[in-house]
């Protein structure tokens, strides 16, 4: 009896072991399948971000910068990541865009760093210090390789915002009146923004802040005598040349436009979508800047040959005033703090290497 009992117990034990192995195998297979399920779920995730632009829909940059970014992002993510685009003022405009992005009202916007100079010590350098650099590639180098964008984000990220340069471009003034002297220039009221306000004021003009969609009317009705919105591309797309035929050279300076993103919204993206987005923005900065230079040449040719635009050099007296103003602005930027001083050192070092200082 004892022997039969032992046999039955052994049989039960072996059966239990077999059942245990089968259950363990089932569990293992289920566990192994989990990453695939998660992966499939992530692959199926679809995201649509509202993007508030500071560009009016008539602006060349709305279509050639933002709309192209949206198109490429949708293509590269197989339709999983879409951008819903809003022109200037549809949700917010100008300086307000930073706050609606920071608060998460919209996850993304475009902006001129000149609208938010007080948000980071090096923001003025990211916007562009008037009268310092002379080519777009120099601004690109300062922004990316010499670290100015990174310096700005050191202060913005803790506030919940990431800024990424969109393109570097020249800033040039268009005027209703032809000027030939410092006295002529000192009589002007001009629309401006950022550190360009101080730069123009130092040379005697009376700069004013006017929102993008309102600039054309301000020029045409005489509220201002001229404006800058980029350079030739902006003047053509915003129709400034219809009412202001004098295009001034050289450039007041070189600036960056930028994308701003809510950090929490960025971090919520599936890793693959986040990677695609960040890589595309970085790629587009270089491609768009170079493309913009060709568009500048085409736009200015159109203005001169078809619209009666005249390219006018700034009088020597005005250029001397600009030179002094540039140095004063640079000193003010440097005095903003340790981060700003580091950025100014990078800028002045570059200028020295280029023979500008």
What are these regions (language model features)?
Residues 1-5:
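N-terminal acidic, proline/glycine-rich, low-complexity intrinsically disordered segments
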Residues 142:
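Mid-sequence acidic-hydrophobic segments that form the walls
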Residues 8, 13-38, 42-138, 147-357:
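N-terminal secretory/targeting leader peptides
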């Amino acid at each position: 009896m004892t022997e039969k009992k032992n046999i039955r117990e052994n049989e039960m034990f072996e059966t239990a072991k077999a059942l245990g192995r089968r259950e363990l195998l089932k569990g293992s297979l289920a566990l192994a399948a989990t990453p695939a399920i998660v992966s499939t779920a992530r692959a199926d995730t679809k995201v649509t971000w509202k993007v508030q632009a500071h560009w009016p829909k008539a602006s060349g940059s709305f279509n050639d910068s933002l709309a192209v970014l949206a198109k490429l992002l949708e293509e590269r993510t197989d339709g999983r990541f879409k951008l819903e685009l809003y022109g200037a003022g549809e949700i917010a405009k100008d300086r307000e865009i930073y706050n609606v992005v920071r608060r998460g009202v919209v996850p993304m916007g475009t902006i001129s760093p000149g609208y938010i100079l007080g948000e980071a010590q090096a923001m003025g350098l990211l916007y562009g210090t008037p009268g310092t650099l002379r080519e777009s590639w120099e601004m690109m180098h300062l922004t990316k390789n010499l670290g100015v964008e990174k310096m700005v984000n050191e202060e913005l990220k803790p506030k919940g915002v990431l800024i990424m340069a969109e393109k570097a471009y020249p800033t040039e003034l268009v005027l209703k009146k032809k000027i030939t002297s410092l006295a002529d220039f000192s009589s002007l009221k001009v629309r401006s923004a950022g550190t360009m306000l101080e730069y123009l004021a130092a040379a005697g003009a009376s700069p004013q802040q006017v929102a993008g969609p309102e600039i054309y009317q301000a020029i045409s009705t005489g509220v201002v005598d001229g404006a800058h919105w980029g350079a030739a591309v902006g003047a053509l797309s915003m129709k400034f040349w219809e009412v202001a035929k004098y295009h001034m050279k050289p450039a007041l300076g070189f600036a960056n436009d930028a994308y701003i993103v809510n950090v929490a919204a960025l971090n919520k993206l599936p890793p693959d979508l986040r990677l695609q987005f960040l890589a595309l923005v970085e790629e587009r900065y270089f491609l768009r800047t170079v493309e913009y230079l060709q568009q500048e040449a085409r736009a200015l040719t159109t203005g001169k040959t078809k619209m009666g635009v005249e390219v006018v050099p700034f009088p020597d007296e005005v250029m001397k005033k600009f030179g002094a103003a540039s140095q004063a602005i640079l000193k003010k930027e440097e005095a903003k703090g340790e981060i700003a001083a580091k950025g100014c050192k990078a800028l002045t070092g570059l200028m020295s290497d280029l023979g500008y200082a």
